[in-house]
Amino acid sequence: MESQQLHQNPHSLHGSAYASVTSKEVPSNQDPLAVSASNLPEFDRDSTKVNSQQETTPGTSAVPENHHHVSPQPASVPPPQNGQYQQHGMMTPNKAMASNWAHYQQPSMMTCSHYQTSPAYYQPDPHYPLPQYIPPLSTSSPDPIDSQNQHSEVPQAETKVRNNVLPPHTLTSEENFSTWVKFYIRFLKNSNLGDIIPNDQGEIKSQMTYEEHAYIYNTFQAFAPFHLLPTWVKQILEINYADILTVLCKSVSKMQTNNQELKDWIALANLEYDGSTSADTFEITVSTIIQRLKENNINVSDRLACQLILKGLSGDFKYLRNQYRTKTNMKLSQLFAEIQLIYDENKIMNLNKPSQYKQHSEYKNVSRTSPNTTNTKVTTRNYHRTNSSKPRAAKAHNIATSSKFSRVNNDHINESTVSSQYLSDDNELSLGQQQKESKPTHTIDSNDELPDHLLIDSGASQTLVRSAHYLHHATPNSEINIVDAQKQDIPINAIGNLHFNFQNGTKTSIKALHTPNIAYDLLSLSELANQNITACFTRNTLERSDGTVLAPIVKHGDFYWLSKKYLIPSHISKLTINNVNKSKSVNKYPYPLIHRMLGHANFRSIQKSLKKNAVTYLKESDIEWSNASTYQCPDCLIGKSTKHRHVKGSRLKYQESYEPFQYLHTDIFGPVHHLPKSAPSYFISFTDEKTRFQWVYPLHDRREESILNVFTSILAFIKNQFNARVLVIQMDRGSEYTNKTLHKFFTNRGITACYTTTADSRAHGVAERLNRTLLNDCRTLLHCSGLPNHLWFSAVEFSTIIRNSLVSPKNDKSARQHAGLAGLDITTILPFGQPVIVNNHNPDSKIHPRGIPGYALHPSRNSYGYIIYLPSLKKTVDTTNYVILQDKQSKLDQFNYDTLTFDDDLNRLTAHNQSFIEQNETEQSYDQNTESDHDYQSEIEINSDPLVNDFSSQSINPLQLDKEPVQKVRAPKEVDADISEYNILPSTIRSRTPHIINKESTEMGGTVESDTTSPRHSSTFTARNQNRPGSTNEMIDLTSQDRVNYGLENIKTTRLGGTEEPYIQRNSDTNIKYRTTNSTPSIDDRSSNSESTTPIISIETKAVCDNTPSIDTDPPEYRSSDHATPNIMPDKSSKNVTADSILDDLPLPDLTHKSPTDTSDVSKDIPHIHSRQTNSSLGGMDDSNVLTTTKSKKRSLEDNETEIEVSRDTWNNKNMRSLEPPRSKKRINLIAAIKGVKSIKPVRTTLRYDEAITYNKDNKEKDRYVEAYHKEISQLLKMNTWDTNKYYDRNDIDPKKVINSMFIFNKKRDGTHKARFVARGDIQHPDTYDSDMQSNTVHHYALMTSLSIALDNDYYITQLDISSAYLYADIKEELYIRPPPHLGLNDKLLRLRKSLYGLKQSGANWYETIKSYLINCCDMQEVRGWSCVFKNSQVTICLFVDDMILFSKDLNANKKIITTLKKQYDTKIINLGESDNEIQYDILGLEIKYQRSKYMKLGMEKSLTEKLPKLNVPLNPKGKKLRAPGQPGHYIDQDELEIDEDEYKEKVHEMQKLIGLASYVGYKFRFDLLYYINTLAQHILFPSRQVLDMTYELIQFMWDTRDKQLIWHKNKPTKPDNKLVAISDASYGNQPYYKSQIGNIFLLNGKVIGGKSTKASLTCTSTTEAEIHAVSEAIPLLNNLSHLVQELNKKPIIKGLLTDSRSTISIIKSTNEEKFRNRFFGTKAMRLRDEVSGNNLYVYYIETKKNIADVMTKPLPIKTFKLLTNKWIH
């Protein structure tokens, strides 16, 4: 019955070409994403009808008909079973999958559905389902892979398939599988399934539908019995029985491998090489083929490989055939070397062929007669033959030889010959090295040339060869000029000999010339006749005069040829010859020097200026022009770099013609920022239209008065100097030109003001191009000279002088010549920035040096002198008394300039001017100098500070002209997380200068610190003081009684880490150690050269710098013992606020109360004399190599925030020298690395589709993910995420508007499984979103504050979740996404309507949407300054994306908000919070236990228990629990880390995971770990074994204390006020590069709500500065929190700040307006005073032992760590 139905309705079932058909359902094996049509939602069911071509019938599938695929016809009689295929995968008639939301990848179980095909597939047999036509296996058939391209693709509009498609034969044996699979692939391609078949690279053109997959699976099963499959195929199918595509892909790969061997042999046999590609590329290609054959066990011998290569050589490489023809032991490497040699030689010659010679096609008909010395015939040759003329051999030129000395009248030939023959070195020249390429034009077909032969030319007087391969004894050409019959010059590179070895052993040699500029190699019969050799053209031989035959000659075409096999090769790879013309160029000036002297002008301008005599005392012939046109000045490349060339003719074409100086162009440039006030910030330029003469004037501002003064000056100058009147001035429409003042000025003088018109960008081209040129020159000159930027206008001035003196490419004269002025006298010009010595006419004393180092800038406008910059005086002077400094190492030398030394050349050029200066200096005494030299008047006076204070100057020390020896210091390797990505690591090692305690200062509790200077200045002062009375090299004695008198007895000192040091006795008993150190020691204080004794002070306590205002030694609070914690900050409203009220209820450790007079307390208040040189660590940060302890660390000189100034008198009084080590640079590539440190990559917790569903072996979990998948799809369609009414073609949409998408899956903390369809925002184009929009979420401090207030006020806490929150927000931009895979619309796009998750703008759109709804519909208001915190009179809401936390005293108020939200959003109540018992929440990762009116506990035990074991960190390896996250005294070794790159990346990734999780936990509630997390985060990119161990130790401590919680208790109801307190602390200089660690803890009503630990952004120079920095970081956040608390709770608030630094409190308290030494920290201190007094903030002192913020700044011993944390986290 069933069979009859099949025959009656052949279209009812499809794809049944398999062994048997069963209708028995196996539910466990259905596809997890398959749903029945009856259960399909209405909107989904409609979506499947898109583009449907026909309606379905009860007998067909609900899937639309696909006219591009076919399948076998069903069969009434099932074929035999084909083996072990799983029969539950067979297609059943009643299992048509309608919805088919399946990914194109293979499901684990195959369910078949109907597949619409054409009845014309093939003629089915009623007794057997498969065609009877089975071609025998022995029948040869074309390779289906090779014939695939023969089948054209079926057009999209085609609705019928090919008729009579032959199915593949059935597999008969395992050995025939490779043959069978070819027919099977061809069968699929003929069935129009080629797009889903993988190619040899494993790629597919289109995604496979479920029906296509089922069809392939069933046909493969039908034609390939399982027991006949190869083993490797069975292994694939055992893993996934339906993975047929993998089998096909590997089969194609195996076929490609089998075909590769044949392809390699074909490629090797057909090798061709003519030099068009590089020899290296050819060698790599051949070697790759041979190596691939070798891997297939096919060995190709060198002899065979050489023969195959030689067979394919052509062009200049042909001669290798003859050379290797007789060799039996050919080596492949030798052949490659010969090919490389010829290629390099041809490359050099091609690069040096000149292009100025005429082509051969320009030659005329020439009749040439052989010389009388030979018996050769006369030949006539036509060089202009037509296309119909008979092909001829190579041209034979009439070549004549002439000597330079005999052709004195032929100047142009002599000059061209001379200028093209310069040597690249003084001693040798490479043949063809300096010639330019000029490819010869072949007027004769190249096929007429007889390869490897010389053309015998009877008309040539010289033998010419193109290759130097046969040239012996080569020397450069210096005397001979060669011309052809048309008297055109032929450049000759070299002269040598050709050696012949003829048949009978006769050897001879003739003279030959080498030139690449001929068509063929020419053998002169005249040269042969000189050797008694003649040519017999009747017998075609070369013969001696006695008739001996030497060699045969061959007639080819119309000419005779001699084989090159008789030539003896020279066998040299690079011919070098002596420079015979060296004496002619030895006195020439090198072009780089002239280029620098003339302001880095271009080659053409300089050459043209010299030809026009625009520059005097210098001729064009005096300059070495070799490589001048191709010379690349590195400074020009950097300084003149432009985007593109200026458009020619950009100036207005309708400009009228004016006389000189009647039409001016002007423009203003500026401002230039970050300059001293005395330096100009602008300049205004003028250009004359006629002469192009240029003027520049400096400007400090753009005020009307300044501009008017310049115009007055320029007009007066032109009128008096050039007797001309300015008629028109062209300018732009800037306000400086269009103001009324200037307009009136022009009107009164009858000058036309010509302004640019709207949108006319070309009208002002002259002035704009001038400014661009001047700025290019300015940048180049400053970069080349290395001078500071404040001299920028001097560079512009120099450039203007040079530009006025040079001829521009468009003019025949320079601007000076056009203006009637004399040319530039080059003897008056020095290179910009040339080091010079200027005479000092007024030294400090008669024995002081008379010379001051300086740098030449430009000639003076107002005198005959030169403007010199004196860095030591920070002035520019106008003087003629200077001497060029010889062999000065400066910035000029860093590019080497072809290793040229310009001192001698510079002296010769300036000899005339120098003699004038020397003559003046000889005749005049120092007292008779000019007035300008006496006064050193400066146009720009930068600063009036003394020389000794110029620490950042780039100048040369006046008294130390020799280059200082650089002492190399190994810099530590570590990562500074706080360094900006645009900065470089500090490059200076800090000083270790012992600091002297001043008597007067110590009586007030302060110290005087000796300031740090640079090594350069310190050595200068030492040199000065050594010869002065009373100077000494020894340090001052620090053991005197009057130096220390402030109770330094029995003081117990500790290291930064807390380990104890021995007691220090009274001053008389203090041990002062001395050691010998160098004045500039290295980092480990090794001594060298000069020595001095340095005291080592072994006293450590906290230091107070002398930069703070004086603090009373014995303030009134200290005199009374009744105030252990005195109120340091009195206030008018503080009558009821005391220290006890602030400290009350704080979780401080319980300590025995000690009076201030106790020794330990005294030591607490005594300023530290300071610590040791630090390295980097979690602990004391000490460096074991450092043996010196100093009182105070100084910040580096490159930290510009603090400028330490030391006068000369201070140094003379102290008789001290700087001990600062030399600067060293740490060369670590951190620019990209720092970004990684700042943004730690989180651990990926989501799964991809294949991970969650396709290959998920956990069936239960997979089912949950499938359910979540369908739920997400339904939600997307329900929310109208995209426009389903229209599909867009991909080719019609701008690609940047197309957004990629994907599905991600994850398991939430509550155990639910979630699927999310997200956009790939990480690759979203910037034009598709507004970068100014921000996605805001609630700040963690705001959440903690809200929770704390809720606990104190018995609030109800309700937790909500809004499903698919982003989908409620519309998008404004026009964006498109690719449809989900189930739709099968690969070339279509959908218009996006909603803010899909992952888009850049989705977060901001949702924030604006929900904010508007809460304000308008829920009567809420957002708290100012705290985004995502909303409140009204009853409810407070904290919003974090789609999570909402509601706080209210009345639960009904929360319910009312929920009801309002549900009207608009799908709102889910996670926890209503109505129970009076303990309620557990999971809020933003925090596990909270809350019982109203009692307590709140915050922890992450469940999360840490789940996540920590997944980090692959060994937990509890010894079975012991850690009691502290780190111990003091552990130091991170900063030696360079040598590690493999892959291992390095792996360890960095591991560090990112570990520190990322630790940071998440630390900033949530484990504030006690923040110091360790912050320190280790700085070393993420330095994953040494030590750093990893410390990180493991931190993770281990987190595991051991995972059950710890942040405990809060309800505030006492008797206290009506809210109390907000910040506790601050700083650890001075315990971070790398002397940075200080600062920390703050914030408490609300005694509950810790936040903490921060970070490295100070500025380098502090004392403990007080570090404490001030910490307090300044705490107060702004304290004020913001105060505003939030007052908004959320209307109770009065008391704000307090606690610190353990009395000096910081005194500074805040002080009203002294005395100027601080450090302006940066002085500014901070003054701001603190204003904030404290203006915000009613109470500042109190807290003992260090009670300061819980101490855990944020340093590692502590276990006992101390527990003592400070056990009150608030346990």
Curated annotation (Swiss-Prot):
<feature type="binding site">
    <location>
        <position position="1700"/>
    </location>
    <ligand>
        <name>Mg(2+) 3</name>
    </ligand>
</feature>
<keyword id="KW-0695">RNA-directed DNA polymerase</keyword>
<feature type="short sequence motif" description="Bipartite nuclear localization signal">
    <location>
        <begin position="1193"/>
        <end position="1227"/>
    </location>
</feature>
<dbReference type="GO" id="GO:0004523">
    <property type="term" value="F:RNA-DNA hybrid ribonuclease activity"/>
</dbReference>
<dbReference type="GO" id="GO:0003677">
    <property type="term" value="F:DNA binding"/>
</dbReference>
<feature type="region of interest" description="Disordered">
    <location>
        <begin position="1170"/>
        <end position="1205"/>
    </location>
</feature>
<feature type="region of interest" description="Disordered">
    <location>
        <begin position="1"/>
        <end position="86"/>
    </location>
</feature>
<keyword id="KW-0917">Virion maturation</keyword>
<feature type="binding site">
    <location>
        <position position="1361"/>
    </location>
    <ligand>
        <name>Mg(2+) 2</name>
    </ligand>
</feature>
<feature type="region of interest" description="Disordered">
    <location>
        <begin position="1146"/>
        <end position="1165"/>
    </location>
</feature>
<dbReference type="GO" id="GO:0008270">
    <property type="term" value="F:zinc ion binding"/>
</dbReference>
<feature type="region of interest" description="Disordered">
    <location>
        <begin position="359"/>
        <end position="453"/>
    </location>
</feature>
<feature type="compositionally biased region" description="Low complexity">
    <location>
        <begin position="369"/>
        <end position="381"/>
    </location>
</feature>
<feature type="site" description="Cleavage; by Ty2 protease">
    <location>
        <begin position="1232"/>
        <end position="1233"/>
    </location>
</feature>
<keyword id="KW-0064">Aspartyl protease</keyword>
<comment type="function">
    <text>Capsid protein (CA) is the structural component of the virus-like particle (VLP), forming the shell that encapsulates the retrotransposons dimeric RNA genome. The particles are assembled from trimer-clustered units and there are holes in the capsid shells that allow for the diffusion of macromolecules. CA also has nucleocapsid-like chaperone activity, promoting primer tRNA(i)-Met annealing to the multipartite primer-binding site (PBS), dimerization of Ty2 RNA and initiation of reverse transcription.</text>
</comment>
<dbReference type="GO" id="GO:0003887">
    <property type="term" value="F:DNA-directed DNA polymerase activity"/>
</dbReference>
<feature type="compositionally biased region" description="Polar residues">
    <location>
        <begin position="1009"/>
        <end position="1034"/>
    </location>
</feature>
<keyword id="KW-0233">DNA recombination</keyword>
<dbReference type="GO" id="GO:0003964">
    <property type="term" value="F:RNA-directed DNA polymerase activity"/>
</dbReference>
<dbReference type="GO" id="GO:0032196">
    <property type="term" value="P:transposition"/>
</dbReference>
<keyword id="KW-0814">Transposable element</keyword>
<keyword id="KW-0963">Cytoplasm</keyword>
<dbReference type="GO" id="GO:0004190">
    <property type="term" value="F:aspartic-type endopeptidase activity"/>
</dbReference>
<keyword id="KW-0238">DNA-binding</keyword>
<feature type="active site" description="For protease activity; shared with dimeric partner">
    <location>
        <position position="457"/>
    </location>
</feature>
<keyword id="KW-0548">Nucleotidyltransferase</keyword>
<keyword id="KW-0862">Zinc</keyword>
<dbReference type="GO" id="GO:0015074">
    <property type="term" value="P:DNA integration"/>
</dbReference>
<keyword id="KW-0255">Endonuclease</keyword>
<keyword id="KW-0645">Protease</keyword>
<feature type="compositionally biased region" description="Polar residues">
    <location>
        <begin position="19"/>
        <end position="39"/>
    </location>
</feature>
<keyword id="KW-0479">Metal-binding</keyword>
<comment type="subunit">
    <text>The capsid protein forms a homotrimer, from which the VLPs are assembled. The protease is a homodimer, whose active site consists of two apposed aspartic acid residues.</text>
</comment>
<feature type="binding site">
    <location>
        <position position="1443"/>
    </location>
    <ligand>
        <name>Mg(2+) 2</name>
    </ligand>
</feature>
<keyword id="KW-0229">DNA integration</keyword>
<feature type="binding site">
    <location>
        <position position="1667"/>
    </location>
    <ligand>
        <name>Mg(2+) 3</name>
    </ligand>
</feature>
<feature type="binding site">
    <location>
        <position position="732"/>
    </location>
    <ligand>
        <name>Mg(2+) 1</name>
    </ligand>
</feature>
<keyword id="KW-0547">Nucleotide-binding</keyword>
<dbReference type="InterPro" id="IPR001584">
    <property type="entry name" value="Integrase_cat-core"/>
</dbReference>
<comment type="function">
    <text>The aspartyl protease (PR) mediates the proteolytic cleavages of the Gag and Gag-Pol polyproteins after assembly of the VLP.</text>
</comment>
<feature type="compositionally biased region" description="Polar residues">
    <location>
        <begin position="49"/>
        <end position="60"/>
    </location>
</feature>
